């Protein structure tokens, strides 16, 4: 009996669809006008998407207006926001489990990276630290390294001081470096996470050579990557970002690894995508992506010239993109940690002249060569079109 009812309903639905199509044809509407590339159905879908985008834009503007009025720290869904920030409250961005997004009054966006404060994570530090002595901070660091060991892969890179005798703005000595690191670790332990820029550090005007870099980096979509800066320049620039009473900083190595753990544990992203081959989640040479974002731009000559907006790769190509060009490059609402440009961190690489560290992949290589967890080294004098950075707040 149930089978017959379902079958009858199915026939009725099919008959209704056929009837509508026949009536449209009788009214002079052809099948191609209905289903073609510029057909009624496709246009209706596009109109729906544009309406949704328009709705999101309005919510973003409202959040930015709210942020301008937030002169004190606020709490939202159990997370403390810096002064001058507000949650976007947009579907898909309004949950810690999805990657909670906040904005300042000018459209700079950050994502909350949750770091669980549990006995499983802090096996040696425990959950009762209040004084945060150097020894206790060392235990916190050791526990977080163990928690993220799958992304370290036995590396010798460490969040340790190494001198930079060439550039101005680096840490003066080991104590100054350790003080900054312990401040970060203390904040993560107390607040159960930290904020990270949703986008690679960006800049409004395209930068095509090394040298002085004074423009404050932004965290917005569809702007040029802030490249051609050295590691120490990136540190200085990150510290200039307005963050209220929070600290804005270039990321330490452990923070990068904690983001990957967050993506895996909350976003159910398979570690093979993060550690072995990130092709499908980043702008790599062998990712044959199709960009439909009309506000994005692309470059085929390492950022010397950009063109907009949409582009489809049919073959392996080296194409540099503006920030946040496509949602397929986003995990937990954090864009471009795999591919596009490499990103400087505060981590020490080697003891010799190649002491600086950058993470992730870039547009000139395949996804299995430089996956998201990748660590590489370079010199204190190095800067390039393919190296940028990202800001964190804690």
PLM region descriptions:
Residues 73-123, 248:
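GGW-centered surface loops in extracellular recognition modules
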Residues 33-58:
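Aliphatic-rich helix starts adjacent to a transmembrane/signal segment
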Residues 106-107, 135-336:
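Short aromatic-cysteine micro-motif
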Residues 50, 57-75:
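Beta-strand/loop motifs with alternating small/hydrophobic and polar/acidic residues, enriched
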Residues 10-32:
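N-terminal single-pass transmembrane signal-anchor helix
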Residues 229-232, 236, 242, 247, ...:
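Disulfide-stabilized, aromatic/cysteine-rich ligand-recognition loop
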Residues 116-120, 199-203, 346-352, 363-365, ...:
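Acidic glycine-/aspartate-rich tracts in secreted/extracellular proteins
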Residues 1-11:
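N-terminal leader/signal peptides at the extreme start of proteins
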